[in-house]
């Protein structure tokens, strides 16, 4: 049983978030959520992917992450970029990028779950926009690696709790194509 099952945003907070970001009032029935607890993947890469897909439509996020899995398009790295290689990227102004394939696969599964939840609630999937995506550290799995001469080295495996919240927005507010917001903060 997962230890952390709570979303960081309640339905009321998600409604307020949609109003602040898009200036549109939606009801709690127009919001779909998906949660993936204790995934064995990199927390740093998960934060970057979650930050990147926020603001995209469900279709845009799925197509971009499928291209990441195929190693066609990268994810821009904003925070955890020390000593990272600079790549030829499809955008200008942000040369640090990675192809986190394992994280992209897990996010694709989560987005599939989100799409099914949206369909179950009766939402139009073409107008569903990701308004919140977050990756939080989960608990550590303690392991021991046997070494030579009777020694043992302890190492921990990090888990990640990922949540995605989407809302059905009016057609005039839904982004037609995704513009990369790569301005340095």
UniProtKB/Swiss-Prot annotation:
Keyword ATP-binding in record: no
Record GO biological process: cytoplasmic translation
Gene Ontology annotations for the cellular component aspect, listed alphabetically: cytosolic large ribosomal subunit
Signal peptide feature range: none
InterPro entries reported in the protein's UniProt record: Ribosomal_uL22, Ribosomal_uL22_euk/arc, Ribosomal_uL22_sf
Keywords: Ribonucleoprotein, Ribosomal protein, RNA-binding, rRNA-binding
GO molecular function, one term: structural constituent of ribosome
NCBIfam families per record: PRK04223.1 (NF003260), uL22_arch_euk (TIGR01038)
Quaternary structure and interacting proteins, as annotated: Part of the 50S ribosomal subunit.
Stated family: Belongs to the universal ribosomal protein uL22 family.
Annotated PANTHER family: 60S RIBOSOMAL PROTEIN L17 (PTHR11593:SF10)
Alphabetized HAMAP family for the sequence: Ribosomal_uL22_A (MF_01331_A)
Functional summary from the UniProt entry: This protein binds specifically to 23S rRNA. It makes multiple contacts with different domains of the 23S rRNA in the assembled 50S subunit and ribosome. The globular domain of the protein is located near the polypeptide exit tunnel on the outside of the subunit, while an extended beta-hairpin is found that lines the wall of the exit tunnel in the center of the 70S ribosome.
UniProt protein name: Large ribosomal subunit protein uL22
């Amino acid at each position: 049983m997962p230890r952390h099952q709570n979303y960081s945003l309640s339905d009321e907070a998600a409604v307020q978030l949609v109003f602040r970001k898009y200036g549109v009032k939606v009801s709690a029935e127009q919001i779909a959520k998906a949660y993936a607890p204790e995934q064995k993947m990199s927390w740093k890469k998960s934060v970057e992917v979650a930050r990147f897909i926020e603001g995209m439509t469900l279709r845009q996020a799925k197509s971009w992450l499928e291209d990441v899995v195929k190693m066609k398009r990268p994810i821009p790295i904003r925070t955890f970029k020390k000593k990272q290689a600079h790549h030829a990227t499809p955008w200008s102004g942000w040369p640090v990028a990675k192809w986190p394939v394992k994280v992209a696969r897990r996010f694709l599964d989560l987005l599939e779950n989100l799409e099914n939840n949206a369909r179950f609630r009766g939402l139009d999937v073409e107008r569903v926009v990701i308004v919140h995506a977050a990756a939080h550290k989960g608990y550590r799995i303690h392991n021991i690696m046997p070494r030579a001469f009777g020694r043992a080295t302890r190492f921990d495996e990090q888990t990640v709790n990922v949540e995605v919240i989407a809302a059905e927005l009016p057609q005039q507010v839904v982004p037609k194509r995704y513009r990369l917001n790569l301005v340095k903060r």
